[in-house]
């Protein structure tokens, strides 16, 4: 039987981005990809990202995160999920004991989180990575503000010349001149996610700059598909826009699930502020993992 059988979890969301928070700090178990897929397949625990807490390794940190996508793959960063973890570690009656600030370890590095209100948190996502080999890309591009990539006819592409950024996970941001909702991202997204230019696959965003301090964004999330919100994609969109001088270094990013405020500081760190919501708590039924043994 899986050690996750009958284990407690929290179903949350950050702007509609479906998050499950699982506390394994009292366990040595590491979630297997097939277990993550089984959790995602159950309507009660469906997620875009599964945020798993482990005991910290680095002194002075509060927990170590492993982040799973719906397809069982792992991700280096999830801003919306990190805010949900911060809420749980502060306010949940079982998990909650953190203060106004906490520091989490992730594959992307240390994430500092600050409480803004009972439901809103600011996450320091760290500096963006902009070199082609840091993103990574499969071939050199000296200027990643716009790279040679398009989809559609050569003389009339549907999308072209994205900016590429890593926020601990790879992002390609295509700037468009009309509402991103008018594009068939459900069809285009998986083609671009798996493009040979992205050896680790990529998150694909369509960004419409509507003002110097506002971006409208839609995201195809690597390993998860269409999502109502993606915090790291919002960070990448602001960085990509600011590098092209399409916006300033602070903007409100509007996603289908709501707004995030993104600021790219003079210290090169990108900070994201947004809400969290607890939907319910539950326990995994043992039968859920029957096929994941």
Swiss-Prot record:
Keywords: Amino-acid biosynthesis, Cytoplasm, Isomerase, Lysine biosynthesis. It is found in: Cytoplasm. Substrate binds at residues 17, 49, 69, 79-80, 169, 203, 221-222, 231-232. Pathway: Amino-acid biosynthesis; L-lysine biosynthesis via DAP pathway; DL-2,6-diaminopimelate from LL-2,6-diaminopimelate: step 1/1. GO terms for cellular component: cytosol. The record marks 171, 221 as: Could be important to modulate the pK values of the two catalytic cysteine residues. This is Diaminopimelate epimerase. It comes from Methylobacterium sp. (strain 4-46). The gene is dapF.
């Amino acid at each position: 039987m899986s050690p996750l059988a009958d284990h407690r979890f929290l179903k949350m969301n950050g702007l509609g981005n479906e998050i499950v928070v699982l506390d394994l700090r009292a366990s040595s178990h590491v979630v297997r990809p097939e277990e993550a897929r089984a959790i995602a397949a159950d309507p009660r625990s469906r997620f875009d990202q599964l945020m798993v807490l482990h005991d910290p390794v680095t002194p002075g940190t509060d927990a170590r995160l492993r982040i799973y996508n719906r397809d069982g793959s792992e991700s280096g960063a999830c801003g919306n999920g990190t805010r949900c973890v911060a809420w749980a570690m502060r306010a949940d009656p079982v998990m909650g004991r953190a203060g106004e600030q906490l520091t989490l370890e992730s594959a992307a590095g240390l994430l500092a989180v600050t409480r803004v209100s009972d439901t809103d948190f600011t996450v320091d996502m760290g500096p963006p990575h902009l070199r082609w080999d840091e993103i990574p890309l499969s071939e050199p591009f000296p200027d990643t503000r716009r790279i040679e990539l398009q989809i559609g006819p050569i003389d009339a592409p549907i999308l072209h010349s994205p900016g590429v950024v890593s926020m601990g996970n790879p992002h390609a941001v295509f700037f468009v001149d009309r509402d991103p909702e008018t594009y068939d991202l459900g069809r285009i997204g998986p083609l671009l996610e798996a493009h040979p230019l992205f050896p680790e696959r990529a998150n694909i965003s369509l960004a419409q700059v509507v003002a110097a301090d506002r971006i409208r964004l839609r995201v195809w999330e690597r390993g998860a598909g269409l999502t109502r919100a993606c915090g790291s994609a919002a960070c990448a969109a602001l960085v990509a826009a600011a590098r092209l001088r399409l916006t300033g270094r602070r903007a409100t990013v509007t996603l289908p699930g709501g707004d995030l405020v993104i600021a790219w500081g003079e210290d090169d760190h990108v900070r994201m502020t947004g809400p969290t919501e607890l939907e319910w708590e539950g326990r995994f039924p043992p039968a859920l993992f029957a096929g994941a043994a």
